Amino acid sequence: MPFKMIAQDVNKDKLSPLNVECTHAKCDDQLHSYRQKPKNKKIILQEDFWATPAQKKGSCWACGIDLVDWPRVHNKDLSDVIYTFNMMNTELVRYVYWHTSIDQKAINHVLRKGKLQLHFAAENRLRRCVAKPENYREGYQTPKQGNIIFYAQHATACRCRKCMEYWHNIPMGIQLSDPQINYFVELIMLYATARMPQLQENGIKVPPIRNNGRLFVNGLT
């Protein structure tokens, strides 16, 4: 993934999950990227923009701003989660996932599940896809849309081990503990209920999506 500065003339609210990465920044809108920039990594910049020559760990690789109280975020304190979410909204990719429209398939899917089944599904996905210390698909194990859990993982920086490392201070080379998994499940649930306040404890019946007179249910016709 190239480190890229999004052009100033691009409306931040027109960006979608399909065209942003955790290595992208839009500093003119105060939306940054805190991903550590490897040496000699290719960077795509605007013509009038110069990246900072040396990145302080935890600062934006593009403009050098250091906004986040990282020890506070790394405490993983759910009673202080509003601060964590506010700071995540200063990073471009997280901002997009907190504000983008959720696709209808994902909406229908989670309404059918309800909170109780969603909680179970979130834990199951974390254990299968990101709990292990090594994954040959590291960085690509979480799709960008189609399920509210995917949106939540990107929004709360638990979609891959690299994001977990710099946002939550969990080294890549260790197995996630049960308390860590439980913390991420709670972040996912908080995201889901914030984005979909109509979500009920138990699932509800939702009509299948119609497209040109044909019924689409979970991608099947």
Each language-model region and where it sits:
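Short, intrinsically disordered, charge-biased short linear motifs at domain edges
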Residues: 6-15, 40-53, 139-151
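Short metal-coordination and nucleic-acid-contact micro-motifs, chiefly zinc-binding Cys/His arrays
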Residues: 15-23, 52-59, 153-156
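Short cysteine-rich clusters marking metal-coordination/redox-active sites
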Residues: 22-25, 60-63, 163
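Short cysteine/histidine-rich metal-coordination sites, predominantly Zn2+-binding motifs
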Residues: 75-86, 175-179
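Amphipathic protein-protein interaction modules
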Residues: 133-175
